Structure formats: C-alpha cells, structure tokens
C-alpha cells in the first residue's frame, strides 16, 4: 500500500488512500496532484508552519539502510511482527511540527487504520523515527498479547483479568549493557533537540517526547519502583518537564522526595515494547513493579540496565531513555497540551523542571507516540480491555457478588463513563454496586458517570445501555449524585479554581428489585441467542 493523504471534506475530514497521485473524488484531490490540498489540511496551524507540511511522503521499508542483522528485540521485534501481518506502514518526508500530529489524529479516528512510522523527517537525521497508532486496532493488540486476532471483546477482557489475577511477577534481570547503551549522551553532549519530537496538537506549548512513554520513578520512603505514562515536554537541549496528575503513583513518589527537600530521580523511556507501554498505563497493584508484571505475562524476565545517575532500572532494549532529576526547587511553565478528554484541559502553569543527566538511545532510535485526542482514540482501543478487567476485579475484590461484566467506555476516555452488569441477588444490590464502582481505584480518578444494568444488557453497546437507562431508570428514584470525589487538573467540566474534586452521577438502570416479578418482559433474543444467530446467519448480510 502506498500511503498518501488527501482532503475529503474540508476543513477537517482526512483520509488514507491507496494510490499516490490518483484523484479519488475528493474536493481538492490528493496533495500529490494538488499541492494546495496539504495547505487546507494544515489550516489550523500558524501560517509559518504551513509551508513545512508540503514534503512528499513516500513508502519505504521499515528497517533503515545499514540496520543491524542481529535478531530484533523490544519494539523492533514487535515491528517485525506487525510488518509480517501487513499492519505497518512507513512514510518519509512528513514534518514533525506541521504534519505528524495531523496524520496521527486522522489515524486515531479512522477504523482499522495501520500503525505508521515516520522516517526521513525534515530537519532530522534519517533513521531517527516516530511510530504512531501502534495499538490502534484489535488485530495488533491481540497479536501483541499472543492471542487469536478474532478474539471476542469479553474474552479479551477476561484475558486481562486473568493476567491481573494470576500472573506471578518476575524480577527484572540486570545486565551490564544492551541495545539502549549503543549511544550515550552526557554533559555537554546532551541534546534532546536531536530527536524528531512532534508538535502533536496545533496549540501545544511545545514538543512532547513523552506520550507513548513509560516514566520510571522510585518512592523515597519504601523504594518501590513505578512506571507510569505521564506527559513529558521538551524545553531545550538539556531540560524537559514531566506532568503527573495528583493521586498518581508517580506523583506520590514525587511527594516523598519533595517533602524531604530533595530532587526526584526519574527516567523518561520514549520507545518501549507496546506491552510495556500498556502496562505503564494500567492500574496494576501498587506493590507490583510494571516491568516485573510484564515479565510475568511474557514468562521471561525483562532485562534492565542501571541508570548511572539515578540507579533506576531501564529496559535494556528500549529505544530512548532520558535520565535525570525532577527539581524540587525550580519550576518553568509547562503546557498547554491537548489531553485525553479532547480539550486543552489546562493552560500553561509552573511545573518542576526535569534536568537531564544522560540520554541513552539505540542506533536509529524510534519515538513511540500516543498523543491524546478527542476520545475514542488509539489509547482507548487498548485501555478499554485492561481497565474494564481492572474495574470488574476491584468491585469483586470489595466482596460484591453477582458482578458479571464491567466496561470502561472509550467515549469517556475509559475513565469518565463506566458501565457494570450484574445479576441481582438481593435488595439494594444494584445501588451497592454503583456506589462501590464509583470509588474503587480504577474509577476514582476523574470519573463522571456510573451506570449499573442487568446482565441481559450488552454493556459494550451504547444503544442497549441507553435503552436500559430510558426504560428501567426513573430519574427521581434511580439517579443519585455523589460529591467530593477525586478529580484533577484535566477535568474540563470543573471550574479552574476548584479542580481537586468533582461529583459522580450513579444511575441504577436495573429492573426494580421490589417489583421485579411484575416488570414487563423484554422482547428480542438473549445475548447468547443473538450471538449464535449472528454466527450462524451472518452470511445473509454479505
């Protein structure tokens, strides 16, 4: 497939087409035949950037010239696997400041779009690359997890739940060196600006190298290591910023250092194997280091080196690792940044400066990018399974019986809108589930709406969920508001001066227990019969 970009419905509807230079009936045609097409695509950018977006993109092999013939590890092994199943596209000549972010937004909001790697980025060394949309469809996600590509939604959720319940973490394996140590910058040689870090959204405060990243920290109090996905902005050659929302493990670690008047050691890893990246954004138990959990999932210990300046573990086959200290006594304006709620959720504000002490990187390094967009976008396409499994597990862990399924819906960024299905067992059961589901760890941070339904509802189908709400829930009787719940700076619905807490709407959309035997019977087949009919008679619709 040859990748080109064209404008189908100005000004914001972008598409991917198969033939470079052909006209596809769009209003402007492909940029290859109509150079002004790319101008319309970048109409929201400052005028001085528009000219930089006209570089011709062309397909290339995913391995740069002169690449090593050694067996691939880490992200590169994953790239080989995706290339083998036709899920990877590589293009050259796309500008990091003007166009990579736009193309990524298009990919995130196009069903079944490929993973795309950008190379020969204007102004940067050829071979220094950016990978986006890595886990943007179920086929790539299933392959990454070693599962059948046609696995069902709830089988995938159950797989994640088993991983959370049954996996025995494997301690990381310390090695002296690895691919990550092929190149090391220290002292005056440090230059973060050598990496082709994109401007992901037109109004971002600068380039953010940390989007599809894992940021490694350690608690000063108990030494527990955490790897979380937090945004990281590049200021200049030797300094950056790391924004961590209150309540997150990395922020709790930061507090232990700052409260002692000390800088926090940290490592920004911008190029992990996608499974490691997934783990960094999943609320696994706090006492389990993410790299050890991934090792348990894979059945093989993750090899790490020890950071020279921080002593923190760094995956030996990562692409880029930026080691340094988050200053407790020095701040600089960070942001704004387009966030997962679909808004520039906060203005620029002072945040601690991250002083870089060393940069480790592989030959021909790859930045893994997963910038937030208006949901649903790439992150939700994989987070919805792991977070749904975690939510169900935590409700059951609170001792609540009868929970048959949970779903952290992608339209709410897998945080704002959660649905739980239950088999009602006793009076008040559905209310109990709603209250607990609004406050467990998975749903606590920046939640908004919790809906509890009976187990005859397919909770992944919004039509069925809203049908249950509109036909089984009476607003006065079944809709309750919980106040004083944990929110954060990224909550767009909360006044800028009161971002710490928000309220939760809990909707009991179950049939009323008090007169369950008199509630009207629903028409239509059960979920099981419906699925059987689709499997048996799907050919009728071909």
Question: What is each of the regions a protein language model found here?
Answer:
Residues 1-3, 7-10, 37, 41, ...:
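Terminal low-complexity, poorly structured segments
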Residues 2, 11, 36, 52, ...:
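Charged/polar low-complexity intrinsically disordered segments
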Residues 3-7, 14, 19, 24, ...:
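Short hydrophobic targeting helices and cationic amphipathic motifs
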Residues 8, 22, 32-33, 40-44, ...:
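Ala/Thr-enriched low-complexity intrinsically disordered regions
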Residues 25-26, 38, 64:
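Compositionally biased, intrinsically disordered low-complexity segments enriched
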Residues 42-54, 58-353, 357-542:
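Extended, highly charged
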């Amino acid at each position: 497939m040859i990748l080109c970009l064209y404008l189908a419905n100005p000004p914001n509807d972008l598409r991917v087409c198969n033939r470079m230079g052909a006209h596809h009936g769009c209003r402007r045609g492909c940029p290859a035949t109509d150079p002004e097409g790319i101008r319309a695509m970048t109409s929201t950018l400052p005028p001085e950037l528009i000219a930089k977006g006209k570089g011709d993109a062309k397909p290339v092999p995913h391995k740069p010239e002169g690449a090593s013939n050694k067996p691939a590890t880490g992200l590169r092994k994953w790239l080989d696997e995706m290339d083998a199943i036709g899920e990877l596209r590589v293009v050259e000549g796309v500008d990091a400041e003007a166009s990579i972010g736009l193309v990524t937004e298009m990919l995130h909001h196009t069903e079944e779009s490929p993973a795309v790697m950008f190379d020969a980025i204007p102004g940067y060394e050829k071979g220094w690359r950016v990978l986006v949309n890595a886990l943007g469809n179920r086929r790539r996600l299933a392959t990454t997890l070693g599962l059948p590509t046609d696995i069902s939604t709830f089988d995938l959720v159950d797989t994640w739940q088993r991983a959370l319940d049954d996996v025995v973490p494997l301690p990381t394996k310390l090695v002296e060196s690895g691919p990550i140590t092929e190149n090391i910058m220290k002292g005056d040689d440090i230059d973060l600006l050598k990496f082709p870090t994109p401007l992901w959204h037109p109004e971002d405060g600068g380039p953010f190298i940390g989007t599809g990243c894992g940021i490694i920290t350690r608690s000063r109090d108990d030494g527990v290591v955490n790897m979380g996905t937090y945004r990281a902005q590049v200021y200049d050659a030797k300094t950056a910023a790391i924004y961590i929302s209150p309540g997150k493990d990395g922020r709790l670690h930061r507090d232990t250092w700052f409260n002692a008047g000390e800088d926090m050691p940290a490592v920004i890893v911008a190029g992990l194997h996608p499974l490691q990246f997934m783990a960094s954004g999943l609320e696994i138990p706090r006492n389990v280091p993410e790299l050890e959990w991934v090792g348990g999932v894979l059945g093989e210990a993750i090899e790490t080196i020890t950071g020279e300046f921080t002593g923190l573990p760094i995956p030996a086959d990562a692409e880029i690792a930026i080691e340094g200290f988050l200053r407790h006594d020095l701040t600089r304006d960070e942001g704004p940044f387009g966030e997962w709620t679909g808004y520039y959720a906060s203005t620029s504000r002072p945040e601690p400066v991250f002083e870089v002490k060393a940069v480790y990187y592989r030959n021909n390094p790859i930045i893994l990018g997963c910038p937030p967009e208006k949901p649903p976008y790439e992150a939700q396409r994989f987070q919805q399974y792991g977070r749904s499994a975690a939510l169900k597990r935590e409700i059951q862990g609170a001792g609540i019986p009868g929970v048959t399924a949970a779903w952290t819906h992608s339209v709410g960024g897998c945080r704002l809108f959660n649905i739980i299905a239950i088999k009602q067992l006793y009076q008040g059961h559905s209310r109990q589930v709603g209250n607990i589901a609004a406050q467990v760890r998975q749903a606590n941070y920046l939640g908004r709406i919790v809906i509890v339904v009976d187990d005859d509802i397919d909770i992944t189908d919004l039509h069925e969920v809203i049908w249950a709400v509109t036909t089984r829930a009476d607003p006065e009787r079944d809709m309750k508001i919980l106040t004083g719940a944990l929110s954060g700076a990224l909550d767009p619905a909360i006044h800028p001066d009161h971002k710490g807490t928000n309220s939760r709407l809990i909707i009991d959309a179950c049939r009323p227990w008090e007169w369950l035997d008199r509630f009207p019977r629903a028409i239509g087949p059960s979920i099981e019969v419906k699925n059987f009919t689709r499997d048996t008679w799907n050919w009728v619709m071909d």
